[in-house]
Amino acid sequence: MKLSADLKAFEGRIGHQFREPERLLRAVTHSSLSSVTRSDNQRLEFLGDRVLGLVMAEALLAADRAASEGQLAPRFNALVRKETCAAVAREVALGDVLKLGRSEMMSGGRRKEALLGDALEAVIAAVYLDAGFEAARQLVLRLWGARIAQVERDARDAKTALQEWAQARGLPPPTYEAVDRSGPDHAPIFTVEVRLGNGETDRAAAGTKRVAEQAAARALLARMEARHD
């Protein structure tokens, strides 16, 4: 088959020309558009998640040969989580070439973090099946680029770090509450409040509750650590 102009341009952006173009088409096809004659990208996403994990594990081990498993695990999680995958997907304009059903398209599917992250994992799997592990490894290293070297030495997610801070001071785990929702249905903004057992609170807003919780925890932890330094 012959790829459309937009998919050919996408090949250029990711630096891989598919020997079997059908693999790329499947990788960018969401389940909202799948049919008997058109497969979606869910199985590719499953495989791509594992390929990405192996590439990142190898890269982190090579980057810091003295790090323990306990130090490497949070760095790994920071590099493979959906928010990171979605950010990488945006950098190569993956959303522009996604094949979506009408309802998913109307609800802003091209901008959804989960959908973008899943599709990027599917693309990684498509490259793996098309040209082997080394091609997939080079793709991941190329797309993630400096993120691997710059991942924080202590890359625990903010909610975990805040909970550990609280427990070390005899406080119960922080609580999180969604206190507001604004914006249109296809691009909502959630405001989340985090509260510590000592009465300290902070708020943050983001496009998903998960990201808002992380941002609120990060802000409160920074304030608490600055106050107790």
From Swiss-Prot:
Residue positions binding Mg(2+): E45, D118, E121
GO terms for biological process, alphabetical: mRNA processing; regulation of gene expression; rRNA processing; tRNA processing
Key words, A-Z: Cytoplasm, Endonuclease, Hydrolase, Magnesium, Metal-binding, mRNA processing, Nuclease, RNA-binding, rRNA processing, rRNA-binding, tRNA processing
PROSITE patterns: DS_RBD (PS50137), RNASE_3_1 (PS00517), RNASE_3_2 (PS50142)
Domain DRBM residues, every copy: 157-226
Transmembrane regions: none
One Pfam family this sequence matches: Ribonucleas_3_3
Cofactor(s) the record lists: Mg(2+)
Superkingdom of origin: Bacteria
Residue ranges of every copy of the RNase III domain listed in the record: 7-132
Localization, UniProt: Cytoplasm
Cellular compartments per GO CC: cytoplasm
Family membership: Belongs to the ribonuclease III family.
Biological role: Digests double-stranded RNA. Involved in the processing of primary rRNA transcript to yield the immediate precursors to the large and small rRNAs (23S and 16S). Processes some mRNAs, and tRNAs when they are encoded in the rRNA operon. Processes pre-crRNA and tracrRNA of type II CRISPR loci if present in the organism.
Subunit and partners: Homodimer.
The protein's name: Ribonuclease 3
Gene transcribed to yield this protein: rnc
